[in-house]
Amino acid sequence: MATAANQIGRVTQVIGAVVDVQFEGHLPAILNSLETKNGGNRLVLEVAQHLGESTVRAIAMDTTEGLVRGQEVTDTGAPIRVPVGEGTLGRIINVIGEPIDEAGPVKADNVRAIHQEAPTYTDQSTEAEILVTGIKVVDLLAPYAKGGKIGLFGGAGVGKTVLIQELINNVAKAHGGYSVFAGVGERTREGNDLYHEFIESKVNADPHNPDPSVKSKCALVFGQMNEPPGARARVALTGLTIAEDFRDKGQDVLFFVDNIFRFTQAGSEVSALLGRIPSAVGYQPTLATDMGALQERITTTTKGSITSVQAIYVPADDLTDPAPATSFAHLDATTTLSRSIAEKGIYPAVDPLDSTSRMLSPLVVGEEHYAVARQVQQVLQRYKALQDIIAILGMDELSEEDKLTVARARKVERFMSQPFHVAEIFTGSPGKFVELADTIKGFKGLVEGKYDHLPEAAFYMVGTIEEAVEKGKKLAAEAA
């Protein structure tokens, strides 16, 4: 640790987000946080390289306009530290832990450095366990692993945000766990919308006029598109640090990253400014290392778990691009949202044939769950294969067996829809959390033909199969 006398350095060069600082004597360690004043505001820099004997190259966490050569910079002697604990819930903070929602300072339990070691092998839990989300289609066909990493794919307007909100809501209700949302390099407007939607759907209390009946369940950390690459490259770590603190207190935490591609993109911008020779497609040479350092910290320990849901943008829809390809290596499950399903009015618009999970194995979920999931996929796959024939020749040309398959598949499709708690304000129908046993029982009955007598409409936007039967009776009574 440096003494006070040699903790002061001076700016020698500013190139965009990269600042060189000269220190007399003791050099700050790599990843140390340096501080200076810029137009009355605190500007934080993070040491990235040592150049020669007395100069360090640092990355700015905010804009560097207004910095001048010769300006004083202080070495804090530690990495960037951010507030953690329940005081962060319902608040929006930035990469360096400052509140940006204009609701006063964050009442934190303590602070924690954003750079942490991944948990050791001895601390990690080895049991494969499912995180029940209460969302039928996810729990049946692409179940999430506790402490796993899930990739969320979907275009604009197919319901990613609503699905994320429902997951936050359900994890809080079913597991008593908190969530952390890291907005990495996305639109500021979307972050603002999300913040207000969380308050409207009672996921969070409004910090400006708190409602005592609403308890905040989610902390928000933002480093948006307009921010310098330093902030975007580190904001995911800030969010993860808050999540790790909740996990170490014995909770099952959900950690959302929107968007993991922007984390890589920011790393690539910083890398070029630091003068590193780029690798494939112009990405940073340390692409896999950076991604690994983040992803390896997301895991289940003997105390609790962090389950991460990561929205993944695929540049030009090219899955072989190094950025998405590197993130795929870490995923345990993928949830793909499909526009064609959303167009049918089936929400959540999860594609049952395109979403996958490593947990869907008889050894983890049990024989019955596995068999039902495979039967459901088989029925849907057969329906998909028959769609061309139906489009050209019509339903009448199908064999009796195929007609039955199509009828069941359409019921299965509709039964995969379900009303969400967070969408109650738009739909007017109360949300449903469906237990795993009820989900398996419902789909098992459907594919076995127990409910062939019920109309399709009975299965649309209900929770359990019992509700579908009730709805079927109601529809029959209305028709009569």
From Swiss-Prot:
It comes from Bradyrhizobium sp. (strain ORS 278). ATP binds at residues 154-161. It is an enzyme of class 7 (translocase). Pfam families: ATP-synt_ab, ATP-synt_ab_N, ATP-synt_VA_C. GO terms for cellular component: plasma membrane; proton-transporting ATP synthase complex. This is ATP synthase subunit beta. It is found in: Cell inner membrane. InterPro entries: AAA+_ATPase, ATP-synt_VA_C, ATP_synth_F1_bsu, ATPase_a/bsu_AS, ATPase_alpha/beta_chains, ATPase_F1/V1/A1_a/bsu_N, ATPase_F1/V1/A1_a/bsu_N_sf, ATPase_F1/V1/A1_a/bsu_nucl-bd. Disulfide bonds: none annotated. It is a peripheral membrane protein. It comes from the Bacteria. GO terms for molecular function: ATP binding; ATP hydrolysis activity; proton-transporting ATP synthase activity, rotational mechanism. It catalyses: ATP + H2O + 4 H(+)(in) = ADP + phosphate + 5 H(+)(out). Its EC number is 7.1.2.2. The gene is atpD. Keywords: ATP synthesis, ATP-binding, Cell inner membrane, Cell membrane, CF(1), Hydrogen ion transport, Ion transport, Membrane, Nucleotide-binding, Translocase, Transport. Produces ATP from ADP in the presence of a proton gradient across the membrane. The catalytic sites are hosted primarily by the beta subunits. Belongs to the ATPase alpha/beta chains family. F-type ATPases have 2 components, CF(1) - the catalytic core - and CF(0) - the membrane proton channel. CF(1) has five subunits: alpha(3), beta(3), gamma(1), delta(1), epsilon(1). CF(0) has four main subunits: a(1), b(1), b'(1) and c(9-12).
